[in-house]
Amino acid sequence: MSEADQLKALRVRIDSLDERILDLISERARCAQEVARVKTASWPKAEEAVFYRPEREAWVLKHIMELNKGPLDNEEMARLFREIMSSCLALEQPLRVAYLGPEGTFSQAAALKHFGHSVISKPMAAIDEVFREVVAGAVNFGVVPVENSTEGAVNHTLDSFLEHDIVICGEVELRIHHHLLVGETTKTDRITRIYSHAQSLAQCRKWLDAHYPNVERVAVSSNADAAKRVKSEWNSAAIAGDMAAQLYGLSKLAEKIEDRPVNSTRFLIIGSQEVPPTGDDKTSIIVSMRNKPGALHELLMPFHSNGIDLTRIETRPSRSGKWTYVFFIDCMGHHQDPLIKNVLEKIGHEAVALKVLGSYPKAVL
Protein backbone atom coordinates (compact mmCIF):
# COMPACT_ATOMS: atom_id res chain seq x y z
CA MET A 1 0.00 0.00 0.00
CA SER A 2 1.34 3.42 -0.96
CA GLU A 3 2.00 6.17 1.57
CA ALA A 4 -0.98 8.13 0.23
CA ASP A 5 -3.28 5.12 0.63
CA GLN A 6 -2.04 4.46 4.18
CA LEU A 7 -2.62 8.09 5.19
CA LYS A 8 -6.08 8.07 3.60
CA ALA A 9 -7.06 4.94 5.54
CA LEU A 10 -5.77 6.41 8.81
CA ARG A 11 -7.66 9.67 8.23
CA VAL A 12 -10.88 7.76 7.54
CA ARG A 13 -10.35 5.91 10.83
CA ILE A 14 -9.68 9.18 12.69
CA ASP A 15 -12.84 10.73 11.21
CA SER A 16 -14.85 7.74 12.41
CA LEU A 17 -13.34 8.02 15.90
CA ASP A 18 -14.09 11.75 16.00
CA GLU A 19 -17.74 11.05 15.21
CA ARG A 20 -17.91 8.50 18.04
CA ILE A 21 -16.22 10.93 20.45
CA LEU A 22 -18.69 13.64 19.42
CA ASP A 23 -21.65 11.35 20.10
CA LEU A 24 -20.29 10.37 23.53
CA ILE A 25 -19.60 13.97 24.57
CA SER A 26 -23.11 14.95 23.50
CA GLU A 27 -24.54 12.04 25.48
CA ARG A 28 -22.54 13.15 28.53
CA ALA A 29 -23.84 16.70 28.12
CA ARG A 30 -27.43 15.44 28.03
CA CYS A 31 -26.76 13.50 31.26
CA ALA A 32 -25.48 16.73 32.83
CA GLN A 33 -28.71 18.47 31.84
CA GLU A 34 -30.68 15.64 33.46
CA VAL A 35 -28.60 16.03 36.66
CA ALA A 36 -29.55 19.71 36.68
CA ARG A 37 -33.24 18.86 36.25
CA VAL A 38 -33.19 16.33 39.13
CA LYS A 39 -31.30 18.67 41.48
CA THR A 40 -33.51 21.65 40.70
CA ALA A 41 -36.68 19.62 41.29
CA SER A 42 -35.53 18.29 44.68
CA TRP A 43 -33.73 21.36 46.04
CA PRO A 44 -35.49 23.62 48.60
CA LYS A 45 -37.16 26.44 46.69
CA ALA A 46 -35.70 29.10 49.00
CA GLU A 47 -32.13 28.06 48.14
CA GLU A 48 -30.06 28.00 44.97
CA ALA A 49 -29.20 24.45 43.89
CA VAL A 50 -25.50 23.53 44.11
CA PHE A 51 -24.25 22.00 40.87
CA TYR A 52 -20.48 22.26 41.27
CA ARG A 53 -19.07 19.76 43.74
CA PRO A 54 -15.28 20.07 44.25
CA GLU A 55 -14.99 16.58 45.73
CA ARG A 56 -16.80 15.04 42.75
CA GLU A 57 -14.65 16.95 40.23
CA ALA A 58 -11.46 15.81 41.99
CA TRP A 59 -12.62 12.18 42.04
CA VAL A 60 -13.46 12.16 38.33
CA LEU A 61 -10.09 13.60 37.32
CA LYS A 62 -8.17 11.17 39.54
CA HIS A 63 -10.25 8.28 38.18
CA ILE A 64 -9.48 9.29 34.60
CA MET A 65 -5.76 9.47 35.38
CA GLU A 66 -5.88 6.01 36.98
CA LEU A 67 -7.62 4.52 33.93
CA ASN A 68 -5.41 6.25 31.36
CA LYS A 69 -3.16 3.86 29.41
CA GLY A 70 -1.51 6.45 27.13
CA PRO A 71 -0.07 7.54 24.80
CA LEU A 72 -1.27 10.90 26.21
CA ASP A 73 0.16 11.47 29.69
CA ASN A 74 -2.12 11.63 32.73
CA GLU A 75 -2.13 15.42 33.10
CA GLU A 76 -2.91 16.00 29.43
CA MET A 77 -5.78 13.53 29.59
CA ALA A 78 -7.09 15.15 32.78
CA ARG A 79 -6.95 18.59 31.13
CA LEU A 80 -9.08 17.33 28.24
CA PHE A 81 -11.67 15.96 30.65
CA ARG A 82 -11.53 19.17 32.71
CA GLU A 83 -12.74 21.10 29.65
CA ILE A 84 -15.46 18.55 28.91
CA MET A 85 -16.65 18.78 32.51
CA SER A 86 -16.50 22.58 32.41
CA SER A 87 -18.66 22.71 29.28
CA CYS A 88 -21.17 20.24 30.72
CA LEU A 89 -21.37 22.13 34.01
CA ALA A 90 -22.08 25.34 32.09
CA LEU A 91 -25.23 23.64 30.75
CA GLU A 92 -26.35 23.05 34.35
CA GLN A 93 -25.23 26.37 35.84
CA PRO A 94 -22.45 28.63 34.49
CA LEU A 95 -20.02 29.29 37.33
CA ARG A 96 -19.06 32.87 38.15
CA VAL A 97 -15.45 33.11 39.30
CA ALA A 98 -13.59 36.22 40.50
CA TYR A 99 -9.81 36.51 40.24
CA LEU A 100 -7.06 39.09 40.66
CA GLY A 101 -7.11 40.98 37.36
CA PRO A 102 -6.83 42.44 34.86
CA GLU A 103 -7.21 39.86 32.09
CA GLY A 104 -4.02 37.98 31.34
CA THR A 105 -2.78 37.49 34.93
CA PHE A 106 -1.51 34.21 36.34
CA SER A 107 -4.57 34.28 38.63
CA GLN A 108 -6.80 34.06 35.56
CA ALA A 109 -4.67 31.22 34.20
CA ALA A 110 -5.09 29.41 37.53
CA ALA A 111 -8.87 29.95 37.45
CA LEU A 112 -9.11 28.49 33.95
CA LYS A 113 -6.84 25.57 34.84
CA HIS A 114 -9.04 24.68 37.82
CA PHE A 115 -12.53 25.38 36.42
CA GLY A 116 -12.02 25.15 32.64
CA HIS A 117 -12.75 27.77 30.00
CA SER A 118 -16.56 27.65 30.24
CA VAL A 119 -16.75 29.69 33.46
CA ILE A 120 -17.75 33.34 33.58
CA SER A 121 -14.57 34.93 34.92
CA LYS A 122 -14.56 38.34 36.58
CA PRO A 123 -11.29 40.29 37.02
CA MET A 124 -10.95 42.31 40.23
CA ALA A 125 -8.52 45.13 41.01
CA ALA A 126 -7.26 43.72 44.33
CA ILE A 127 -7.13 40.48 46.32
CA ASP A 128 -9.45 41.90 48.99
CA GLU A 129 -12.03 42.67 46.29
CA VAL A 130 -12.02 39.00 45.27
CA PHE A 131 -12.89 38.10 48.86
CA ARG A 132 -15.62 40.75 48.98
CA GLU A 133 -17.25 39.47 45.77
CA VAL A 134 -17.44 35.96 47.20
CA VAL A 135 -18.78 37.12 50.58
CA ALA A 136 -21.43 39.24 48.85
CA GLY A 137 -22.56 36.28 46.72
CA ALA A 138 -21.80 38.14 43.50
CA VAL A 139 -19.70 35.16 42.34
CA ASN A 140 -19.66 31.47 43.20
CA PHE A 141 -15.93 31.25 43.80
CA GLY A 142 -12.77 33.32 43.93
CA VAL A 143 -9.18 32.45 43.02
CA VAL A 144 -6.37 34.06 45.05
CA PRO A 145 -2.60 33.45 45.17
CA VAL A 146 -1.35 32.26 48.56
CA GLU A 147 2.31 31.28 48.14
CA ASN A 148 5.14 31.16 45.61
CA SER A 149 7.97 28.64 45.66
CA THR A 150 10.52 31.44 45.25
CA GLU A 151 9.10 34.44 47.12
CA GLY A 152 7.03 32.75 49.82
CA ALA A 153 3.63 33.76 51.20
CA VAL A 154 1.30 36.32 49.62
CA ASN A 155 0.56 38.42 52.69
CA HIS A 156 -2.42 40.28 51.19
CA THR A 157 -4.23 36.95 50.90
CA LEU A 158 -3.37 35.83 54.43
CA ASP A 159 -4.55 39.16 55.84
CA SER A 160 -7.83 38.89 53.91
CA PHE A 161 -8.56 35.57 55.64
CA LEU A 162 -8.35 37.43 58.95
CA GLU A 163 -10.95 39.95 57.80
CA HIS A 164 -13.51 37.79 55.99
CA ASP A 165 -15.60 34.76 56.93
CA ILE A 166 -14.98 32.50 53.98
CA VAL A 167 -14.33 28.83 53.13
CA ILE A 168 -11.39 27.36 51.21
CA CYS A 169 -12.89 24.93 48.69
CA GLY A 170 -9.84 23.88 46.68
CA GLU A 171 -6.31 24.59 45.53
CA VAL A 172 -4.50 24.77 42.22
CA GLU A 173 -0.79 24.90 41.49
CA LEU A 174 0.48 26.78 38.46
CA ARG A 175 3.95 26.47 36.97
CA ILE A 176 5.16 30.02 36.44
CA HIS A 177 7.25 30.96 33.41
CA HIS A 178 8.24 34.59 32.93
CA HIS A 179 9.08 36.06 29.52
CA LEU A 180 10.50 39.43 28.49
CA LEU A 181 7.82 40.86 26.20
CA VAL A 182 7.94 43.73 23.70
CA GLY A 183 5.44 45.40 21.37
CA GLU A 184 5.52 45.84 17.61
CA THR A 185 7.01 49.34 17.88
CA THR A 186 9.54 48.57 20.62
CA LYS A 187 13.13 49.46 19.75
CA THR A 188 14.76 46.50 21.47
CA ASP A 189 18.21 48.09 21.58
CA ARG A 190 16.87 51.19 23.35
CA ILE A 191 14.84 49.72 26.21
CA THR A 192 15.04 52.01 29.24
CA ARG A 193 12.23 50.62 31.41
CA ILE A 194 10.96 47.14 32.35
CA TYR A 195 7.50 46.77 33.92
CA SER A 196 6.24 43.88 36.01
CA HIS A 197 4.67 42.93 39.33
CA ALA A 198 7.08 43.27 42.26
CA GLN A 199 7.15 39.50 42.85
CA SER A 200 7.94 38.79 39.20
CA LEU A 201 10.76 41.33 39.23
CA ALA A 202 12.14 39.57 42.30
CA GLN A 203 11.83 36.15 40.68
CA CYS A 204 13.87 37.36 37.66
CA ARG A 205 16.37 39.50 39.58
CA LYS A 206 19.54 37.61 38.61
CA TRP A 207 18.59 37.45 34.94
CA LEU A 208 17.84 41.19 34.89
CA ASP A 209 21.12 41.96 36.66
CA ALA A 210 22.99 40.00 33.99
CA HIS A 211 21.17 41.27 30.88
CA TYR A 212 19.66 44.68 31.79
CA PRO A 213 21.65 45.93 34.81
CA ASN A 214 21.13 49.64 34.07
CA VAL A 215 17.49 49.54 32.97
CA GLU A 216 14.85 50.94 35.33
CA ARG A 217 12.57 48.32 36.88
CA VAL A 218 9.05 49.57 37.52
CA ALA A 219 6.70 47.60 39.79
CA VAL A 220 3.03 47.70 38.74
CA SER A 221 -0.17 46.09 40.03
CA SER A 222 0.05 42.98 37.84
CA ASN A 223 1.98 41.42 34.97
CA ALA A 224 -1.03 41.96 32.73
CA ASP A 225 -0.94 45.68 33.56
CA ALA A 226 2.75 45.65 32.61
CA ALA A 227 1.89 44.08 29.25
CA LYS A 228 -0.82 46.70 28.60
CA ARG A 229 1.65 49.54 29.21
CA VAL A 230 4.29 48.11 26.88
CA LYS A 231 1.83 47.85 24.01
CA SER A 232 1.86 51.66 23.66
CA GLU A 233 5.49 52.45 24.56
CA TRP A 234 8.44 52.13 22.16
CA ASN A 235 11.21 52.09 24.80
CA SER A 236 9.86 49.64 27.39
CA ALA A 237 9.45 45.91 27.96
CA ALA A 238 7.35 43.78 30.31
CA ILE A 239 7.85 40.61 32.27
CA ALA A 240 4.72 38.47 32.00
CA GLY A 241 3.43 35.05 30.99
CA ASP A 242 2.05 33.42 27.85
CA MET A 243 -1.55 34.48 28.45
CA ALA A 244 -0.64 38.18 28.70
CA ALA A 245 1.56 37.92 25.60
CA GLN A 246 -1.29 36.44 23.57
CA LEU A 247 -3.94 38.77 24.95
CA TYR A 248 -2.02 41.99 24.27
CA GLY A 249 -0.26 40.92 21.06
CA LEU A 250 3.31 41.06 22.37
CA SER A 251 6.40 39.17 21.22
CA LYS A 252 8.89 37.27 23.38
CA LEU A 253 12.30 38.92 23.37
CA ALA A 254 13.50 36.29 25.86
CA GLU A 255 11.73 33.19 27.23
CA LYS A 256 11.68 31.59 30.69
CA ILE A 257 13.83 34.20 32.41
CA GLU A 258 12.89 33.20 35.98
CA ASP A 259 15.96 32.62 38.16
CA ARG A 260 14.74 29.25 39.41
CA PRO A 261 13.60 26.70 36.81
CA VAL A 262 11.10 25.20 39.27
CA ASN A 263 8.97 28.27 39.94
CA SER A 264 5.34 27.69 40.87
CA THR A 265 2.53 29.54 42.61
CA ARG A 266 -0.20 27.96 44.70
CA PHE A 267 -3.68 29.45 44.47
CA LEU A 268 -6.66 28.85 46.74
CA ILE A 269 -10.27 28.49 45.64
CA ILE A 270 -12.50 30.40 48.05
CA GLY A 271 -16.26 30.11 48.35
CA SER A 272 -19.07 29.50 50.81
CA GLN A 273 -19.67 25.74 50.65
CA GLU A 274 -18.06 23.08 52.84
CA VAL A 275 -16.39 20.24 50.92
CA PRO A 276 -16.90 16.61 52.07
CA PRO A 277 -13.87 14.31 52.50
CA THR A 278 -12.30 12.67 49.45
CA GLY A 279 -9.58 10.62 51.13
CA ASP A 280 -6.82 12.89 49.80
CA ASP A 281 -7.45 16.27 51.39
CA LYS A 282 -5.79 19.25 53.01
CA THR A 283 -7.05 21.37 55.89
CA SER A 284 -6.18 25.02 56.47
CA ILE A 285 -6.53 26.66 59.87
CA ILE A 286 -5.78 29.95 61.63
CA VAL A 287 -4.60 29.77 65.24
CA SER A 288 -3.85 32.51 67.76
CA MET A 289 -1.83 31.33 70.76
CA ARG A 290 -1.15 32.94 74.12
CA ASN A 291 2.05 35.01 74.10
CA LYS A 292 4.27 32.79 76.26
CA PRO A 293 7.52 30.80 75.93
CA GLY A 294 7.07 27.54 74.03
CA ALA A 295 3.73 28.54 72.47
CA LEU A 296 4.73 27.42 68.96
CA HIS A 297 6.08 24.10 70.24
CA GLU A 298 2.85 23.57 72.15
CA LEU A 299 0.88 24.31 68.99
CA LEU A 300 2.80 21.89 66.77
CA MET A 301 3.18 19.00 69.22
CA PRO A 302 -0.33 17.48 68.68
CA PHE A 303 0.35 17.28 64.93
CA HIS A 304 3.71 15.60 65.51
CA SER A 305 2.49 13.13 68.12
CA ASN A 306 -0.36 12.02 65.83
CA GLY A 307 1.83 11.71 62.72
CA ILE A 308 0.01 14.42 60.77
CA ASP A 309 2.01 16.06 57.98
CA LEU A 310 2.19 19.85 58.01
CA THR A 311 2.62 21.26 54.51
CA ARG A 312 2.86 24.96 55.45
CA ILE A 313 3.06 27.26 58.44
CA GLU A 314 3.11 31.07 58.23
CA THR A 315 3.08 33.76 60.90
CA ARG A 316 1.31 37.11 60.59
CA PRO A 317 0.81 39.98 63.06
CA SER A 318 -2.61 39.82 64.70
CA ARG A 319 -5.03 42.70 64.19
CA SER A 320 -6.12 42.40 67.83
CA GLY A 321 -3.09 43.78 69.64
CA LYS A 322 0.58 44.79 69.60
CA TRP A 323 3.18 41.99 69.46
CA THR A 324 0.60 39.23 69.09
CA TYR A 325 0.62 36.85 66.16
CA VAL A 326 -1.55 34.32 64.35
CA PHE A 327 -0.38 31.14 62.65
CA PHE A 328 -1.65 29.93 59.29
CA ILE A 329 -1.25 26.15 59.08
CA ASP A 330 -1.93 23.65 56.30
CA CYS A 331 -1.97 19.94 57.13
CA MET A 332 -2.85 16.74 55.32
CA GLY A 333 -6.28 15.31 56.09
CA HIS A 334 -9.87 16.52 56.42
CA HIS A 335 -11.23 18.23 59.53
CA GLN A 336 -13.95 15.55 59.71
CA ASP A 337 -11.32 12.78 59.93
CA PRO A 338 -11.25 11.48 63.54
CA LEU A 339 -7.48 12.04 63.86
CA ILE A 340 -7.60 15.64 62.59
CA LYS A 341 -10.72 16.33 64.65
CA ASN A 342 -8.94 15.14 67.79
CA VAL A 343 -5.87 17.31 67.09
CA LEU A 344 -8.00 20.40 66.48
CA GLU A 345 -9.84 19.82 69.76
CA LYS A 346 -6.52 19.65 71.65
CA ILE A 347 -5.27 22.83 70.01
CA GLY A 348 -8.58 24.56 70.67
CA HIS A 349 -8.22 24.02 74.42
CA GLU A 350 -4.89 25.88 74.47
CA ALA A 351 -5.44 28.48 71.76
CA VAL A 352 -6.83 31.98 72.18
CA ALA A 353 -8.69 31.43 68.91
CA LEU A 354 -8.93 28.64 66.34
CA LYS A 355 -10.67 28.85 62.98
CA VAL A 356 -10.90 26.13 60.34
CA LEU A 357 -10.67 27.90 56.99
CA GLY A 358 -11.66 24.78 55.12
CA SER A 359 -10.85 21.22 54.09
CA TYR A 360 -10.54 20.57 50.38
CA PRO A 361 -9.19 18.08 47.82
CA LYS A 362 -5.45 18.16 47.24
CA ALA A 363 -4.66 19.67 43.83
CA VAL A 364 -5.07 17.10 41.05
CA LEU A 365 -3.61 19.17 38.19
From Swiss-Prot:
Keywords: Amino-acid biosynthesis, Aromatic amino acid biosynthesis, Cytoplasm, Isomerase, Lyase, Multifunctional enzyme, Phenylalanine biosynthesis
Keyword Transport recorded: no
Pathway noted in the entry: Amino-acid biosynthesis; L-phenylalanine biosynthesis; phenylpyruvate from prephenate: step 1/1; Metabolic intermediate biosynthesis; prephenate biosynthesis; prephenate from chorismate: step 1/1
Keyword match Amino-acid biosynthesis: yes
The ACT domain, residue ranges: 284-361
Residues annotated for substrate binding in this entry: 11, 28, 39, 57
GO molecular function: chorismate mutase activity; prephenate dehydratase activity
GO biological process, one term: L-phenylalanine biosynthetic process
Residue(s) at site: Essential for prephenate dehydratase activity: 265
Job description of the protein: Catalyzes the Claisen rearrangement of chorismate to prephenate and the decarboxylation/dehydration of prephenate to phenylpyruvate.
Protein name according to UniProt: Bifunctional chorismate mutase/prephenate dehydratase
Record organism: Stutzerimonas stutzeri (Pseudomonas stutzeri)
